[in-house]
Amino acid sequence: KSHFGNNSVIAIYITSSRYQNEKKPYADKDSFLLSLMELASWDWRNTRILVEHCDAYTKENPNPQKGFLSLSDEINAINQTNDKCGSNIGIVINWGRSVIEHRNVDGPLKHIKHAAQNNVLGGLMFSGTTANNHNLYGAWSDRHMTPATFSDYKYFEPESLMSYQNIKNTLDVCDFSSLDCLGIKLLAMPEESSIEKRIGINRDTMYLLDQAMAELYKA
């Protein structure tokens, strides 16, 4: 704080939790609302609370990776909290988790539009997934797969659904200049990957995001 003042921490990430599927209906929207109300009562200064949406249990996603609350339930709880407490809690859409929930690359676009229409879109997190098992990550897994092969960059996965074009399409449906955060969440595979690779996948993906945003700004 002595160096950055009250802007030291831009946002705090939370999730709605807990796991639910057809047999385990544990996620509770009323408990989540109470938790948000309590969090909103604390003095966060200029730090914003952001709820990262994780894949919810749906008919398309009967065995979810996370299985937390639906986006609609999260948005309703956020809006109730903001209205009652005068807070500014928002939503972060995780690209991979929205793809997993919908089982297609239109999932993130739908979630972004839903959050934006309710004035709670606070950030985007790019984390990949894949539809097949021809890789070390696994089909529809929440293992933070790197983007698909792009240009001459070194660290990419050919089977990833998170292609350059899909990243551009995602950025294009929102005013990303108004977001509190735009991030990446990636995992190097195999588990014994070198430090060089772990750094490289993050570096190359940031280059990719920079290029996508530059092209969109030109347009």
Residue ranges of model-derived segments:
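Short, flexible loop/turn elements at secondary-structure junctions
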Residues: 14-18, 53-55, 95-97, 128, ...
